[in-house]
Amino acid sequence: MTDVASSTPGWITRLMARLGTTGWIGLASFTAFTGWMLIALLVRSTSSERYIFLTDVHWLLSRFGLAVAAVMLAVAVYIGLIRHGDVTAWFRRITYTIFAFMLLQGVVGGVMYLMGGRAGEDVHIIYGYGVVLSLPFFIFVEVTAKKRPAMGSYIWGFTMLAAIIVRCITTGPPA
C-alpha cells in the first residue's frame, strides 16, 4: 500500500511546506471570500443588483483594509522597533494575503468602472493603483534587502497603505 506522502507530486509537497499554516489560512480565507463573492454575483438577477452588491463589497473591503493596515503597522512597529526583530515567515505570509485582498479590491473597483460606475473624484482610480502596488514594492525591498533586520520596509509599507486607503476613501463616491 502506498502512503499519501510518496504518491504526492514533489511540487505540491514543496508548496505545502513553503506556505505553512498561516499561508494556508490566508489562501483559504481568500478563496472562500472570492467564492462567496462570485456565488453572490451569480445569484443576482439584474446588473443593477450586481452593481449594488459590488459597491457594498468595495466599501467593506476599503474599511477592512484600513483596519488591517493599521493593525499590521502596529505589529511591524512592535517587531521592528520595540523587539528589534526581523520579518517572520507568518508576517510575510499575512502580508501576501493582504496584498491578495487589495488586488481583489482593485478588481472589484475595475469591474464597477466597466459597469459604468464612476468615483467621486478621478484621482480615486490613481489612489486605487497605489493601494494595489504599494505592498509589492515594499515586499520586494524587504526580500532583496542585504542588511537585516529589514522590518522598516513593512513599517513604511503599511504606513503608506493606510494613508493611501484613507485618501481613497475620501475621494470615492459619497456614501
Predicted stretch roles:
Residues 33-37, 102-107, 158-168:
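Aromatic-anchored segments of alpha-helical transmembrane domains
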Residues 62-67, 120-132:
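Structural signature of hydrophobic alpha-helical transmembrane segments
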Residues 101-104, 124-138:
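Hydrophobic alpha-helical membrane segments
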Residues 44, 163-175:
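Juxtamembrane boundary at the C-terminal end of a transmembrane helix
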Residues 114-122, 136-154, 170:
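Membrane-helix boundary connector in multi-pass membrane proteins
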Residues 20-30, 40, 49-70, 172-175:
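Hydrophobic transmembrane alpha-helical segments in integral membrane proteins
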Residues 82-92, 143-150:
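Membrane-interface helix-boundary motifs at transmembrane edges
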Residues 75-82, 106-118, 137-141:
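Membrane-helix exit/interface motif
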